[in-house]
């Protein structure tokens, strides 16, 4: 747990019937709710769909062998898209299980991590597409089918990142009264 959230918890030690020490952790911090309520829940479901499409758009272009997957200034940017995509996917699944009332940590992750990862999911495909464009300008030939699939996957990931950035206002939280 991050040091930032340690004041939100209270640890109590008690003895059980067998004489063993049991440690209990209770959340005592502020609780948060979604600013937009049902609209935020719909946005979470839509964002989960975006992540599913993003994973397909990331994995499918890597399967066939192409010029882009063999070029050092194209492939690393495309591979690193998995980091923000994985962070967003994990955060969304975690938030989906959390219920209506959020802890301080969950509220921070919803408000900060999703838009930040959306930014990187926008920038990294741009860099990958830029590298692929340079590759084909240098080679002076048309790309093959696998390279077109790679470019379409990067474009789809770019759209996924833009959609996540656009949905950022839906993930605002407020302190529960």
Region roles according to the model:
Residues 1-40:
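N-terminal, intrinsically disordered, low-complexity segments
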Residues 45-65, 81-85, 120-133, 156:
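Canonical alpha-helical transmembrane segments of integral membrane proteins
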